[in-house]
């Protein structure tokens, strides 16, 4: 998944599907102490193409990363069309204290002002941070951290499309800051 975050537009203006795993490997901003393993699900056409079986398979992959691979944090990169619904499902089905961050992008990677690289970098840094431990699934876009239980897509194309009544924190200048901890029921 995660079509927009890594997609590019060629010289003719046609949108080209990029390899998300290769896109992540090409980023050079990671701290040396963050080890990244990538499980790519390129079979999902776009955010709007995600179906319930895709959500369930993603939950299985995340659970496997946490339980078998001992992941300290997980980042799910996906399209934004059904991000709020998928994030809510991930929170409901996973019930984990391990940081799980959902992110994506509103603009393709080659667009002016593309926010995808910053969203991805912030998501990875946050997932590796102890600050997110016990918060459940969160959505990070445009530096804001939102609980998966309350996030909404408020605009179809604006980079600040996602919001919630009370963002729980933010990632700024690489620092993860949590302002409030949502009450979670298990």
Predicted regions and their residues:
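Internal gly/pro-rich beta-alpha loop/helix module
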Residues: 102-173
């Amino acid at each position: 998944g995660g079509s927009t975050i890594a997609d590019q537009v060629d010289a003719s203006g046609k949108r080209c599907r990029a390899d998300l795993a290769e896109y992540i490997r090409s980023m050079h901003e990671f701290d040396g102490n963050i080890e990244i393993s990538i499980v790519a699900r390129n079979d999902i056409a776009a955010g709007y193409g995600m179906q319930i079986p895709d959500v369930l398979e993603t939950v299985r992959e995340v659970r496997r990363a946490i339980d078998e691979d001992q992941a300290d944090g997980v980042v799910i990169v996906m399209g934004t069309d059904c991000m709020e619904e998928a994030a809510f499902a991930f929170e409901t089905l996973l019930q984990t204290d391990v940081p799980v961050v959902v992110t994506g992008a509103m603009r393709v990677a080659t667009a002016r002002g593309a926010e995808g690289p910053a969203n991805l970098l912030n998501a990875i840094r946050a997932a590796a941070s102890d600050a997110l431990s016990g918060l459940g699934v969160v959505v990070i876009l445009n530096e804001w951290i939102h609980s998966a239980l309350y996030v909404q897509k408020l605009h179809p194309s604006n980079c600040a499309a996602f919001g919630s009544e009370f963002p729980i924190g933010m990632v700024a200048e690489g620092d993860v800051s949590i302002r409030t901890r949502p009450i979670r029921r298990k």
